[in-house]
């Protein structure tokens, strides 16, 4: 069988045994500006990867490329056919009910049953017929997540999906994402500006700078995670350094969490207890 042309569009799903995401010397430019500059990346089956970087570093362009919403100018890119993306804005059709938004674009006979199952997984079985205008921000984002899950993706792309949510809702969404990831085992790429969020959720954190991977750190911390864990502050300190943030104080191997972290840890315990 002929080798597919990989220069401008993602190829079909890789063969068994290969990483579901493979990028080799990928370039994407707008005019003379290279937003992605010779990028190489593998994401293993079922791996949860977080992507950090300053604004303009190429994070969203990379995610859009993996989602099939943008092309590459050169290089090779392989992604699964079964993939889904969730963005910061839920992007729900306001004239369609929750369940119809979940199966939007799918041609299946048991659409409502599939939508109901997906909404049940995200805790919204009771909002099956609700319209987007009646949903809270967290509920709307869960509908968007259900829309991704109903497609049974091998790759789930998350572009800052929690950025507009309040602190407690974000924590609950973090736990929901982890629970669903464990159940469905897709590879996940999360784009975020939040260093703590990246450490809390990911197996591996990658820092993007000027369209290239500056470094990657494996997060070898047990779950459930919070910022008070031994080792959390060490990983945070290193990531902040890679992002160009000066860390003034030396970080001890078992640091005392600052006041904000204590508050967030308490919120996580409260959210997990409910």
UniProtKB/Swiss-Prot annotation:
Residue ranges occupied by any ABC transporter domain in the UniProt entry: 21-235
Reactions catalysed, as given in the entry: ATP + H2O + aliphatic sulfonate-[sulfonate-binding protein]Side 1 = ADP + phosphate + aliphatic sulfonateSide 2 + [sulfonate-binding protein]Side 1
Residues annotated as binding ATP: 53-60
SMART domains xrefs: AAA (SM00382)
EC class: translocase
EC identifiers of the protein: 7.6.2.14
Keywords, in A-Z order: ATP-binding, Cell inner membrane, Cell membrane, Membrane, Nucleotide-binding, Translocase, Transport
InterPro entries: AAA+_ATPase, ABC_transporter-like_ATP-bd, ABC_transporter-like_CS, ABC_transporter_ATP-bind, P-loop_NTPase
GO terms for cellular component: plasma membrane
Cellular location(s): Cell inner membrane
Main location: membrane
Molecular functions (GO terms): ATP binding; ATP hydrolysis activity
Topology in the lipid bilayer: Peripheral membrane protein
Similarity remark: Belongs to the ABC transporter superfamily. Aliphatic sulfonates importer (TC 3.A.1.17.2) family.
Cited function: Part of the ABC transporter complex SsuABC involved in aliphatic sulfonates import. Responsible for energy coupling to the transport system.
Subunit structure: The complex is composed of two ATP-binding proteins (SsuB), two transmembrane proteins (SsuC) and a solute-binding protein (SsuA).
Record-given protein name: Aliphatic sulfonates import ATP-binding protein SsuB 2
Organism: Pseudomonas syringae pv. syringae (strain B728a)
Lineage of the organism: Bacteria, Pseudomonadati, Pseudomonadota, Gammaproteobacteria, Pseudomonadales
């Amino acid at each position: 069988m002929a080798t597919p042309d990989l220069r401008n569009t993602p190829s079909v799903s890789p063969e068994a045994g290969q990483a579901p995401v493979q990028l080799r010397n990928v370039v994407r430019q707008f005019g003379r500006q290279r937003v992605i500059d010779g990028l190489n990346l593998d994401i293993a089956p079922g791996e949860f990867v977080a992507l950090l970087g300053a604004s303009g570093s190429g994070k969203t362009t990379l995610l859009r490329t993996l989602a099939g919403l943008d092309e590459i100018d050169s290089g090779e890119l392989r992604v699964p056919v079964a993939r889904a993306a969730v963005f910061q804005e839920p992007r729900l059709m306001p004239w369609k009910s929750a369940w119809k938004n979940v199966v939007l674009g799918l041609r299946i006979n048991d659409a409502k049953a599939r939508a109901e199952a997906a909404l049940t997984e995200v805790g919204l079985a009771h909002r099956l017929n609700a319209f987007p205008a009646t949903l809270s921000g967290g509920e709307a984002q869960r509908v968007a997540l259900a829309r991704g899950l109903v497609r049974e993706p091998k790759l789930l792309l998350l572009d800052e999906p929690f950025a507009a949510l309040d602190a407690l809702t974000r924590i609950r969404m973090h736990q929901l994402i982890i629970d669903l990831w464990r159940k469905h085992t897709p590879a996940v790429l999360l784009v975020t500006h939040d260093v703590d969020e990246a450490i809390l959720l990911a197996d591996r954190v990658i820092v993007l700078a000027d369209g290239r991977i500056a470094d990657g750190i494996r997060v070898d911390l047990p779950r459930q995670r919070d910022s008070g864990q031994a080792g959390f502050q060490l990983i945070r300190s290193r990531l902040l350094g890679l992002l160009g943030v000066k860390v003034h104080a030396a970080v001890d191997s078992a640091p005392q969490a600052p006041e904000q972290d204590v508050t967030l840890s308490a919120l996580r315990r409260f959210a997990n207890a409910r």
